C-alpha cells in the first residue's frame, strides 16, 4: 500500500557499493550514517545478508534494520513524502476484536506528543553535526579511502559501547522501560545513529530525560511507536516468511505480549495473545509453519473444540427423540406409567406387582393406559362372552334422568309414543377424516392416508399411543353432561370390530376402543342417557367407505372372503350380545344395531336380509331385550313395505337422510329446502313408520344441518364438492342454487360460526327444527354428529353453543306447519 512503500527505484539494493568508489550526496551520506549506526535489532551473525526490503518491511522499527555492509543499506529517506497517507494504526491488518471508538480512544494515548517528536529530531541533527536544513557537511575526501575491515571494526566497537551505556542510563532514568511511550530502549535506538557517546549524553541532559520519563509514566503502558516526521508511520502488510535471523515475535511489543493487543486472540486467563503465526494465520497468510517461534500456534477455541460441540449436539438431539419414545415403550411393555398425572391419579393406590406377568404391557395393564380416569384399575381377567370387563366397577345406579320429559333409566322408555332425541358420537371410536381432519392433514396425497386402515399402517408402532390419545381427548365426560343439558336423551355410539378383535393382516389398534366404549356407556348411565350401539365397521367392510374403516372394495357378503367375513360378523355379534345381555345394561343399552349402512345398492339384497334375520335371532337368543335396528341400505323406503315382513320381533328400521348428497336436493334454495322436509320427508317418514301401511317402527339415525357438501373430506380425502363442481372427474357441473350465476363458493359455507349472519343462523336453526319435527312423526332421531374439529354445520355441540340450535332439543321454536320465518338478505350461494 502507498503509505508503507519505500523509494527503492532511486538506488537498487543490489548495487555493490563496497567494490566501487561512489560519490555520495550529503543527504545520502547522512541517511547512510543514520542507518549504519543503529544495530539494536541486528542479527548476531556478521555475515547476514539482507533480503529485499519488500520481504520484511512489516516491522514498526524497520528503518533501524542493518546489514553487515553499510553500503548495502543505502535507502532514500524522504521525510516530506514517506508518510503522506493518513496515519494508520500499526496493527490494522491484525485488528479483529476491537472496533470503533473504543479501540481508537485507547490508541490515541499512544501517539507521541509533538514536542517529544521535535526534541528527538533535534538530537538526531545535533549528533550528526548538522543543525539546519542543509544537512551534514560534505564527507572528507580521505574518508572514502578507508578500508572495509577497519571501518567495520570501528563501527562495531562504537556501537557496543554506546548500547551498553545508553541502555543502562535510560532504563534507570525512566524507571520502566517497557511502560514508556519513548522508553530508554527506544531512545537508545533513536540516538544510536549519532556519532559520539559523550555528545549524546551532554545534549540530552538529565532534566529533559526526567521530563520525558515522567510523561511516559503518566501515559501508562503504551506501545512503542517510532516517529520520524510530523505524521505517524504506517506499516506494510506482514510477509508470509520472516527474514532469516529475526524472530517473528517482534510483531508485537512488550506490552502486547503481556496484555494482548487489539486483534490478538486472548487466552482464558491472563497472558497475551498467540504468537505471530496465529496472527498471520488469522489473515490467511500463514503456511502452517512454526519455524522461528518458540511457541506453537494455537488455533481458535471453535477450531479446537468444534468436533466436541457437534458430537454433544448430536447426542442431545438423539436423547430428545429416544427418551420420550423409551418412556412410552416402557409404559407399554413393562407397566410403567405417568401415575402422577391427574388422568392416572387412581393408579397411586395400585401396586404394579398386582398385574400378572402375562398381562403386563397388554390392554389389560392399566399402567399402560393413556387415561385411567373413572376406570376401575384393579386387575381382572374376567370376561363375558369372551370380552373383558377390565375397567368396570362392580356396582351401578340406573336412577338418573336426562330431563323431566323422559323417564329415568330404571323405567321403560315409551318408544313409539315418546320420540327419541339423540346424537351420534361419530369420528370417535370409529375414525372419520372429515370429523377429525387433524389426523390426516399431516400427510400428502401421494401417501394415500385416507381412512383408519391406512392411518394405522402409516403410524405403525405409534398407532396405539396416537389413537388412544384421540379416544381419551376427543370425547370426555363433559360431553355427556352437555348432551344432557342440551335436552337430548339418547346417544348413538359408533365402534368397529377391532374394538373386539383383529385378524391376520389388520393394521388396526385392537381392543383399546372397547374400554372407552364401556366407559362411555357408564357416563351415559350417570347422566340418564340411553344408548344405541352402532357397529360402524364390520369384517370386510359393508360399504367400502372410509367410515367403515377401509375405503375401497366391499368384502362383506361379497368377493373371495365374503362368506368368511359374514361368519366373522356373526361371531362378533355373538360376543357382543352375550356381553350386553347382562343385567347392568338392560336399562341403558336400549337399542342394539346390527350394521351401519350396508350398501344394498351393490350387495345382493337377499343375502343382506338373510344375514339380518340370522344375526337378530342370534342376539335375541343370547338375551338381548333391546330394540334391534336394521339399516335401509339406501333403498327407497317404499321398497321396504314388502321386505322382512316376517321378521323377528322388536326390530326397528334405521334410515339416514341428508339433502347435500342428493344432486336434486342440494340445489334447493333455503326456503325450498325447509319446505321439502316439512312436505315430502315428513309424510315419507310418517308412512314408513306405520306397520300396516309401511314397514313399521322407523328412526332417522343420521341427519345434519349441513346445506352444502363443502366440509373438508366429507366426500372422502382428496375429493372435491358437488357445490363447486369439483366432485366428479368427468362432470364440472356446480350443484348450488346460484350455479347459473357462477357464484357457488364454499368460502362462506366453511366459515367459522362467529361470522355467521343472523339470517344464516335463523335458517340453520329452522332447517334443523324442521327435520326434528319430521322425524319425530316416527320413532325419533339422532343428529350426526355431536362434535367435529372444524365442520361447524355437522356438529350439534357447535350449533348449540353458538345459538343456531334450540337451547333444549325438546323445546324447538319451529315445527312443520308453522310459517317459515324470513331469512333476511341471506344469499343463496351458501
UniProtKB/Swiss-Prot annotation:
Glycans are attached at residues 341, 376, 381, 393, 397, 546, 558, 610, 669, 689. Keywords: Carbohydrate metabolism, Cell membrane, Cell wall biogenesis/degradation, Glycoprotein, Glycosidase, Hydrolase, Membrane, Polysaccharide degradation, Signal-anchor, Transmembrane, Transmembrane helix. Glucosidase involved in the degradation of cellulosic biomass. Active on lichenan. It catalyses: Successive hydrolysis of beta-D-glucose units from the non-reducing ends of (1->3)-beta-D-glucans, releasing alpha-glucose. It is found in: Cell membrane. The gene is exgD. Residues 1-11, 74-84 have a biased composition (Basic and acidic residues). Residues 1-307 are cytoplasmic. InterPro entries: Glyco_hydro_5, Glycoside_hydrolase_SF, Glycosyl_hydrolase_5. Residues 329-830 are extracellular. The active site is at residues 597, 702. One of its GO terms (biological process) is cell wall organization. GO terms for cellular component: cell surface; extracellular region; plasma membrane. Belongs to the glycosyl hydrolase 5 (cellulase A) family. This is Probable glucan 1,3-beta-glucosidase D.
Amino acid at each position: 500500500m502507498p503509505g508503507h512503500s519505500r523509494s527503492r527505484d532511486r538506488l537498487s539494493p543490489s548495487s555493490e557499493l563496497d567494490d566501487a568508489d561512489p560519490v555520495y550526496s550529503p543527504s545520502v551520506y547522512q541517511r547512510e550514517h543514520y542507518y549504519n549506526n543503529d544495530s539494536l535489532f541486528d542479527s548476531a551473525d556478521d555475515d547476514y545478508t539482507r533480503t529485499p526490503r519488500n520481504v520484511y518491511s512489516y516491522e514498526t522499527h524497520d528503518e533501524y534494520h542493518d546489514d553487515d555492509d553499510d553500503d548495502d543499506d543505502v535507502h532514500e529517506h524522504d521525510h516530506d513524502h514517506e508518510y503522506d497517507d493518513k496515519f494508520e494504526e500499526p496493527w490494522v491488518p491484525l485488528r479483529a476484536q476491537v472496533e470503533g471508538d473504543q479501540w481508537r480512544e485507547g490508541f490515541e494515548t499512544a501517539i507521541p506528543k509533538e514536542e517529544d517528536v521535535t526534541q528527538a529530531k533535534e538530537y538526531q541533527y545535533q549528533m550528526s553535526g548538522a543543525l539546519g536544513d542543509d544537512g551534514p557537511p560534505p564527507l572528507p575526501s580521505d574518508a572514502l579511502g578507508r578500508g572495509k575491515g577497519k571501518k567495520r571494526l570501528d563501527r562495531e566497537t562504537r556501537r557496543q559501547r554506546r548500547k551498553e551505556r545508553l541502555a543502562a542510563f535510560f532504563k534507570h532514568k525512566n524507571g520502566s522501560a517497557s511502560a514508556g511511550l519513548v522508553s530508554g530502549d527506544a531512545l537508545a535506538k533513536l540516538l544510536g545513529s549519532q556519532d559520539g557517546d559523550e555528545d549524546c549524553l551532554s545534549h540530552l541532559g538529565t532534566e529533559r530525560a526526567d521530563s520525558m520519563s515522567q510523561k511516559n509514566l503518566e501515559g501508562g503502558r503504551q506501545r512503542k511507536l517510532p516517529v520520524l516526521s510530523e505524521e505517524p508511520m504506517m506499516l506494510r502488510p506482514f510477509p508470509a516468511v520472516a527474514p532469516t535471523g529475526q524472530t517473528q515475535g517482534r510483531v508485537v511489543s512488550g506490552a502486547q505480549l503481556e496484555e494482548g493487543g487489539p486483534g490478538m486472540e486472548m487466552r482464558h486467563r491472563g497472558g497475551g495473545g498467540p504468537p505471530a503465526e496465529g496472527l498471520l494465520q488469522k489473515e490467511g497468510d500463514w503456511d502452517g509453519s512454526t519455524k522461528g517461534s518458540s511457541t506453537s500456534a494455537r488455533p481458535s477455541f471453535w477450531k479446537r473444540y468444534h468436533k466436541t460441540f457437534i458430537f454433544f449436539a448430536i447426542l442431545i438431539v438423539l436423547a430428545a427423540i429416544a427418551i420420550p419414545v423409551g418412556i412410552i415403550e416402557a409404559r407399554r411393555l413393562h407397566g410403567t406409567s405417568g401415575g402422577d398425572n391427574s388422568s392416572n391419579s387412581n393408579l397411586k393406590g395400585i401396586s404394579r406387582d398386582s398385574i400378572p406377568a402375562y398381562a403386563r404391557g397388554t390392554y389389560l395393564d392399566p399402567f399402560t393406559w393413556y387415561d385411567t380416569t373413572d376406570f376401575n384399575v384393579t386387575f381382572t381377567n374376567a370376561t363375558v362372552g369372551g370380552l373383558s370387563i377390565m375397567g368396570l366397577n362392580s356396582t351401578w345406579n340406573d336412577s338418573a334422568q336426562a330431563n323431566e320429559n323422559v323417564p329415568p333409566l330404571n323405567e321403560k322408555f315409551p318408544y313409539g309414543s315418546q320420540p327419541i332425541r339423540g346424537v351420534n358420537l361419530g369420528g370417535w371410536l370409529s375414525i372419520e377424516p372429515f370429523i377429525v381432519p387433524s389426523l390426516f392433514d399431516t400427510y400428502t396425497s401421494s401417501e394415500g392416508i385416507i381412512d383408519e386402515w391406512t392411518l394405522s399402517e402409516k403410524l405403525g408402532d405409534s398407532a396405539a399411543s396416537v389413537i388412544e390419545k384421540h379416544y381419551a381427548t376427543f370425547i370426555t365426560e363433559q360431553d355427556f353432561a352437555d348432551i344432557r343439558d342440551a335436552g337430548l336423551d339418547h346417544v348413538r355410539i359408533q365402534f368397529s370390530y377391532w374394538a373386539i378383535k383383529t385378524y391376520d393382516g389388520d393394521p388396526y389398534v385392537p381392543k383399546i376402543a372397547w374400554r372407552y366404549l364401556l366407559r362411555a356407556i357408564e357416563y351415559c348411565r350417570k347422566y340418564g342417557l340411553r344408548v344405541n350401539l352402532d357397529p360402524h365397521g364390520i369384517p370386510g367392510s359393508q360399504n367400502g367407505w372410509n367410515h367403515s374403516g377401509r375405503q375401497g372394495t366391499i368384502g362383506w357378503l361379497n368377493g373371495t372372503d365374503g362368506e368368511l367375513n359374514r361368519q366373522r360378523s356373526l361371531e362378533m355379534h355373538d360376543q357382543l350380545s352375550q356381553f350386553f345381555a347382562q343385567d347392568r345394561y338392560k336399562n341403558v343399552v336400549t337399542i342394539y344395531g346390527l350394521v351401519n349402512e350396508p350398501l344394498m345398492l351393490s350387495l345382493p339384497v337377499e343375502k343382506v336380509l338373510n344375514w339380518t334375520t340370522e344375526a337378530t335371532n342370534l342376539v335375541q337368543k343370547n338375551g338381548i331385550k333391546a330394540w334391534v335396528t336394521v339399516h335401509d341400505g339406501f333403498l327407497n323406503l317404499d321398497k321396504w313395505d314388502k321386505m322382512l315382513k316376517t321378521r323377528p320381533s322388536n326390530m326397528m328400521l334405521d334410515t339416514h337422510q341428508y339433502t347435500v348428497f342428493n344432486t336434486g336436493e342440494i340445489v334447493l334454495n333455503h326456503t325450498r329446502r325447509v319446505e321439502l322436509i316439512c312436505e315430502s320427508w315428513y309424510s315419507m317418514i310418517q308412512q314408513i313408520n306405520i306397520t300396516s301401511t309401511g314397514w313399521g317402527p322407523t328412526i332417522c339415525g343420521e341427519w345434519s344441518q349441513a346445506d352444502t357438501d363443502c366440509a373438508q373430506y366429507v366426500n372422502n380425502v382428496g375429493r372435491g364438492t358437488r357445490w363447486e363442481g369439483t366432485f366428479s372427474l368427468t362432470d364440472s357441473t356446480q350443484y348450488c342454487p346460484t350455479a347459473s350465476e357462477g357464484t357457488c363458493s364454499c368460502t362462506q359455507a366453511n366459515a367459522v360460526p362467529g361470522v355467521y349472519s343472523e339470517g344464516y343462523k335463523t335458517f340453520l336453526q329452522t332447517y334443523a327444527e324442521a327435520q326434528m319435527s319430521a322425524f319425530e312423526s316416527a320413532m325419533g332421531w339422532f343428529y350426526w354428529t355431536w362434535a367435529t374439529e372444524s365442520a361447524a354445520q355437522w356438529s350439534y355441540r357447535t350449533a348449540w353453543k353458538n345459538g343456531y340450535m334450540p337451547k333444549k332439543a325438546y323445546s324447538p321454536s319451529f315445527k312443520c306447519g308453522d310459517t317459515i320465518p324470513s331469512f333476511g338478505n341471506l344469499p343463496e350461494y351458501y
